[in-house]
A protein has these predicted regions:
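Conserved C-terminal helix/linker of AAA+ ATPases
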Residues: 1-5
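Bacterial C-terminal helix-turn-helix
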Residues: 7-71
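C-terminal regulatory domains involved in ligand/effector binding and gene-expression control
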Residues: 71-164, 168-355
Length: 355
């Protein structure tokens, strides 16, 4: 376990030896990060990239006592985050079919997530009020500029807790292989930088719902919980059938392993119709799961329940349009982007009234 950040510690002057100085420095380093993370051991271990068991040994060695009670969830503050350097990704768009790409550029604290049009330089904040459409993907628009299929990159930013970033892009995000796997690698390549300002999670304090589950309609709800989780139930024709999956956020590695690899999918009989409507023009055999004749046609599944996991990926992306990471339990029943955004509007209205 090695400290990675340096801080000014005047008490080092009191050290009688190099070993004693290192011990003093390490103790102050640990205290610095514990205070910065509201004495949350799990969050501190994640940032310092150490195990909880090893970290607790350090606490005992340095006689560091934890506060008797932690701050309530609604008062916990976390450092805002951006990237250390700009990174680039190239690919093709799923719906328009054109070659596209994006540039992720670090932004100062308080900037939020912003999409910037490469051609015009105009920007679109990744906010709920800028949602233009939810047909087969989530599309933002402000003025004459728009950007579509943002849900996969937004899900990745949400789960990696990146709060400030400029995404330079064209009309549509690249689909890559239909999952968020490449976006995870892109963010990690840019390296994360915690910033001096802080944010508080949006803590759900009551239940909200959208849709009528009793009538068999697509339905989604969110309720209070100590942790963030998403459960999804889907009912489709074969080969999908009935699938259920629950994802509980346990750091970005859990997202990278359990949700990010899940790919978008479509039925063969729908592809021709979608193309006529101006969608799926960029659909290729290597960027989505093609289904037909009650079987998967073009690939092997990465998970038995890959379809339900991908629906959760979409939810994670849509929910970051509230501007901050969320704490609550989401339950979805056959829902899509339209239901996700409908629920988000209810949550936002309540937050506005409360504030």
């Amino acid at each position: 376990w090695k400290p990675q950040n340096q801080i000014d510690i005047t008490t080092l002057n009191e050290a009688g030896s190099l070993q004693e100085a290192e011990s003093i420095w390490e103790k102050h380093f640990i205290l610095h990060h514990l205070k910065r993370n509201n004495w949350d051991i799990d969050e501190t271990c994640k940032i310092l990239k150490t195990s909880k068991k090893q970290f607790q040994k350090k606490l005992k060695y340095h006689s560091i006592e934890m506060p008797e009670s932690e701050a309530p969830p609604s008062q916990k503050r976390y450092p805002q985050r951006t990237l250390k350097r700009s990174v680039v990704l190239c690919g093709s768009s799923l719906h328009s079919g054109i070659k596209t790409g994006l540039i992720l550029q670090p932004m100062p604290a308080g900037s939020g997530i912003i999409f910037g049009d490469i051609a015009s330089g105009k920007t679109i904040p990744a906010q709920l009020e800028n949602v233009q459409s939810t047909d087969y993907s989530t599309c933002l628009k402000k003025g004459v500029n728009s950007v579509g299929t943002i849900e996969h990159i937004m899900a990745t930013l949400h789960m990696y807790r990146v709060t400030n970033l400029l995404i330079k892009i064209g009309d549509e995000a690249p689909v890559m292989d239909g999952s968020a796997k490449d976006f995870c690698e892109l963010l990690e390549d840019g390296e994360f930088e915690d910033q001096d300002d802080f944010y508080e999670e949006i803590v759900i304090d009551k239940s909200y719902s959208f849709g009528d589950k009793e009538k068999g309609e697509p339905y989604i709800s969110i309720e209070p919980s100590e942790k963030f989780s998403v459960s999804y139930h889907m009912e489709y024709p074969e080969p999908i059938g009935v699938q259920d999956f629950t994802y509980e956020f346990d750091g970005d590695e859990s997202f990278k392993k359990e949700i990010a690899p899940a790919r978008t999918f479509g039925f063969m009989e729908e592809v021709a119709q979608l193309t006529k409507m101006g969608y799926a023009s960029g659909g290729k055999l290597d960027n989505f799961i093609l289904l037909g004749d009650k079987k998967v046609i073009n690939t092997k599944l990465r998970f038995e329940d890959e379809f339900a996991r991908h629906k959760i990926l979409d939810i994670l992306g849509d929910f970051y349009l509230l501007g901050k990471p969320i704490r609550g339990k989401i339950k979805a029943h056959k829902s899509g982007h339209t239901q996700n955004v409908g629920l988000l509007k209810k949550v936002r209205e309540s937050l506005i009234e409360k504030n």
